Curated annotation (Swiss-Prot):
This is Bombinin-like peptide 2. Pfam families: Bombinin. One of its GO terms (biological process) is defense response to bacterium. Has antimicrobial activity, but no hemolytic activity. Preference on killing Gram-negative non-enteric bacteria. It is found in: Secreted.
């Protein structure tokens, strides 16, 4: 349903954000 789609999108967005922050601080 819509709820699971939003949850899935949110999870992937958080993963992308965490990855971006990790790369930012690694440099």
């Amino acid at each position: 349903g819509i709820g699971s789609a939003i949850l899935s999108a949110g999870k992937s967005a958080l993963k992308g954000l965490a990855k971006g922050l990790a790369e930012h601080f690694a440099n």
